[in-house]
Amino acid sequence: MGEYIMEKNTIILGIETSCDETAVAVVKNGTEIIANVVASQIESHKRFGGVVPEIASRHHVEEITVVLEEALKEANITFDDIDAIAVTEGPGLVGALLIGVNAAKAVAFAHDIPLVGVHHIAGHIYANRLVKEVQFPLLSLVVSGGHTELVYMKEHGSFEVIGETRDDAAGEAYDKVARTLSMPYPGGPHIDRLAHEGKPTIDLPRAWLEPDSYDFSFSGLKSAVINTVHNAKQRGIEIAPEDLAASFQESVIDVLVTKASRAADAYNVKQVLLAGGVAANKGLRARLEAEFAQKENVELIIPPLSLCTDNAAMIAAAGTIAYEQGKRATLALNANPGLDIES
């Protein structure tokens, strides 16, 4: 009888500190979450109406060791069980990134564990692999506070940005519009909730740009909302905030979904993946589902809410691919706030 040899599992420890979440996770074989611990700082930044870099860094320093220990305990493993450490090296806030990178390097050095640097957006894309195995070619619609882009992938680890924002990211526009409507930070979830109570009765612009472009632009829309509110105040006219939220959200989603759908057809992809913090938006999820339900040959993958916002499981998932492809970082690894996903 032939001997049955079980392939060894690949256990990756992920570390994410690019913005205002301190996160550590353990992922098996790039697809299975063993532990996923996130310490959020939203309450600390709320009163400032946005993330304060210095406060974010200070919180990361306080939390990183605690979160790391908690993840190992939750996974019921020791450092000896870990094949590699994957850490977000960029993009993000440089001071915040440094805390995660230095923690990863310290653990890698102390326990002689291989180190892998991960691009934050690659992490968001690979969060989908924790839901379902990905199939190539694929298209990822990345929508977050700092990024709005369409990324085409022919194979693992290969990223081609075919469309990106020329000014504000969608998440940025959400936060600024929320502030105009006197809503707390982060604005996205509040606008989303309010939009479901209103009707899109206010005519707002949609930036389609050139006919063949997959790029985005949200600064004109953001300005139009601010001007609408300002003009209404000057004239003493009452605008229903829920209608303004619904109109703004419809304008954003129209452009995102239409361009993603067009790109999916043009590039003949097998799957479309939703990624990034704004992927938690109920309106966007519903419109994408309706759009891609009509396309028989394209599978839409939408991650659960817990994997949309920043977390370390997605970094471990992306890190697994990099590790299996033989990519390694040295202890000279540094935070790179302007890291390019195509490099």
UniProtKB/Swiss-Prot annotation:
Its cofactor is Fe(2+). Its main location: cytoplasm. It catalyses: L-threonylcarbamoyladenylate + adenosine(37) in tRNA = N(6)-L-threonylcarbamoyladenosine(37) in tRNA + AMP + H(+). Binds 1 Fe(2+) ion per subunit. Its EC number is 2.3.1.234. Substrate binds at V142, V143, S144, G145, G146, D175, G188, D192, N281. One of its GO terms (biological process) is tRNA threonylcarbamoyladenosine modification. One of its GO terms (molecular function) is N(6)-L-threonylcarbamoyladenine synthase activity. It is an enzyme of class 2 (transferase). It is found in: Cytoplasm. Belongs to the KAE1 / TsaD family. Required for the formation of a threonylcarbamoyl group on adenosine at position 37 (t(6)A37) in tRNAs that read codons beginning with adenine. Is involved in the transfer of the threonylcarbamoyl moiety of threonylcarbamoyl-AMP (TC-AMP) to the N6 group of A37, together with TsaE and TsaB. TsaD likely plays a direct catalytic role in this reaction. PANTHER family: TRNA N6-ADENOSINE THREONYLCARBAMOYLTRANSFERASE, TRNA N6-ADENOSINE THREONYLCARBAMOYLTRANSFERASE, MITOCHONDRIAL. This is tRNA N6-adenosine threonylcarbamoyltransferase. The gene is tsaD.
